[in-house]
Amino acid sequence: MLYKGDTLYLDWLEDGIAELVFDAPGSVNKLDTATVASLGEAIGVLEQQSDLKGLLLRSNKAAFIVGADITEFLSLFLVPEEQLSQWLHFANSVFNRLEDLPVPTIAAVNGYALGGGCECVLATDYRLATPDLRIGLPETKLGIMPGFGGSVRMPRMLGADSALEIIAAGKDVGADQALKIGLVDGVVKAEKLVEGAKAVLRQAINGDLDWKAKRQPKLEPLKLSKIEATMSFTIAKGMVAQTAGKHYPAPITAVKTIEAAARFGREEALNLENKSFVPLAHTNEARALVGIFLNDQYVKGKAKKLTKDVETPKQAAVLGAGIMGGGIAYQSAWKGVPVVMKDINDKSLTLGMTEAAKLLNKQLERGKIDGLKLAGVISTIHPTLDYAGFDRVDIVVEAVVENPKVKKAVLAETEQKVRQDTVLASNTSTIPISELANALERPENFCGMHFFNPVHRMPLVEIIRGEKSSDETIAKVVAWASKMGKTPIVVNDCPGFFVNRVLFPYFAGFSQLLRDGADFRKIDKVMEKQFGWPMGPAYLLDVVGIDTAHHAQAVMAAGFPQRMQKDYRDAIDALFDANRFGQKNGLGFWRYKEDSKGKPKKEEDAAVEDLLAEVSQPKRDFSEEEIIARMMIPMVNEVVRCLEEGIIATPAEADMALVYGLGFPPFHGGAFRWLDTLGSAKYLDMAQQYQHLGPLYEVPEGLRNKARHNEPYYPPVEPARPVGDLKTA
């Protein structure tokens, strides 16, 4: 054994060939600060070996290196800029020394090689991969950019266009694509990976492969003519501006850095990467996006822990076909759980099956499946007008009309047709689960399961625990949601649960602004362009359905009369009374016509102004700051109340529910991350300016206490150890 660290070891393999093996405790390898230091020490040992002829890098895990240790990021990002820059210089010196070894090097890459893992293998001369490879640089999705030389080596290896596509989008690619663009040199079966890598090394050692020529382009300026450079970088900047926008500085910074570094050799190019990385790491956007990643891991880990003792349902059923029922049936069948889809009429069943078939055909068109797979999946969805097969189902989700009487009747009838241990769930969006449970003989086997539309795209499923829902019931429903590829978050019961409970105060803020003379178009523009929502409130209401919102608004007002009962007729009332239900009937805040792809396209409609004039004061201008404050304060206050009342368990789960269920702008990180970034005292000052607008603007006492003591909702993060302590090699 030449060297042994906590996460890697170095040993002789054969006749002058050494192997450096990543083998961290636990299930995966991460390129954390300690591993970077160990790698430096191991390379130091290699540099002393006079009989070294070649080096093979590999992993003892199912994946090569999944990336940097993101749990370290928030503390690293608090390190002063000079110290962070110093540590990056140290880390890059390690990879440079790996790249500069006087012998050929190869990485035998299996599974994931992401972020720092990808940057590590870019420093070797050759890369051989297994068919399950996923390799790429996802850093821009975390609000940063590659910091271990990825933005320098990848463009010089692949050419600017392919590298920009991966780096700016934070993409990873599979084995076939990696081979095609030159990111790996070969793909072999897993059992032949090490032997194949040794064979390549022997060819390089014997002079059959010119490893020095292979290495050289990574050390030099990027080989692009002036015209090629102008075209590549201009197109890339245009695409990034269009897709990422101003709220996500990392992608455009990465493109500009690669452009600026193109004319330099490795050392100067790495210095430019360093200078760009450090300021990005200190942005609120990076902290928010890293926070989302960590919250996502927390939520998924919690679901895994919750379901460890239950069996995932093997047969499901959906009550109520149509678009929603068809979407749920498709998602279940697509992920391998056969489903019975029941309705009371053929027309709805046809609609549900058509929806499922349409979604499968899209997968076929994209090349994700072939005709055989399509036929196989669709055959596991069984449409029925009766309860045939319900005696075999493990779980039933009801997705009928949002009417408590209808839902109770359907659930009570279904309970008589299923086994004693079958779980029932309701896909209600607002009706309290404990109320629906009153119709059942086995309320302990019942809970809420709130999907979001469109089901196949929206990652969140709210799992609602009723007063009598058992832990086993919740665990089984969480297991099914996870199997369907969704992110389940368990909440306690109340009108609207969590997501809709906090959404309707936001809509109330919108209604009050319109009442006071604001223009709905300006509100939408501000909330989209400035705050960053994917849709402004007017457009969102049109998509959700004015009739749906009108009904839900009444349910919420009955549930929370003190805050949500209004004493005036609002824009939603006016549009509803005029039979303007949004996109579903082509008339809402806008008029809708189908474009060439059959998608609804909004157009101005003068009739809306007349309708809104009846429920509004004369038009006046509002500043962007006031619009944002008046829209967000009611929502954030309600989010805080939900935490204080135990409706949602943690700030992390609340923020993920907002991001995954409502599209809360990820660069803000969610309501609690936004609050912490803004500061609770500053938020309180802002909210107090608008408390005259009513109870929705009154800040909860718990948040007032936070403001008094300047306490954040997320645990404070300590800066990483001084760089001198980090740098141990």
From Swiss-Prot:
UniProt keywords, alphabetically: Fatty acid metabolism, Isomerase, Lipid degradation, Lipid metabolism, Lyase, Multifunctional enzyme, NAD, Oxidoreductase
Subunit structure of this chain's protein: Heterotetramer of two alpha chains (FadB) and two beta chains (FadA).
Gene transcribed to yield this protein: fadB
PANTHER family: TRIFUNCTIONAL ENZYME SUBUNIT ALPHA (PTHR43612), TRIFUNCTIONAL ENZYME SUBUNIT ALPHA, MITOCHONDRIAL (PTHR43612:SF3)
Site (Important for catalytic activity): 119, 139
Function per UniProt: Involved in the aerobic and anaerobic degradation of long-chain fatty acids via beta-oxidation cycle. Catalyzes the formation of 3-oxoacyl-CoA from enoyl-CoA via L-3-hydroxyacyl-CoA. It can also use D-3-hydroxyacyl-CoA and cis-3-enoyl-CoA as substrate.
Enzyme Commission identifier(s): 4.2.1.17, 5.1.2.3, 5.3.3.8, 1.1.1.35
Protein name: Fatty acid oxidation complex subunit alpha
Keyword Ubl conjugation carried by entry: no
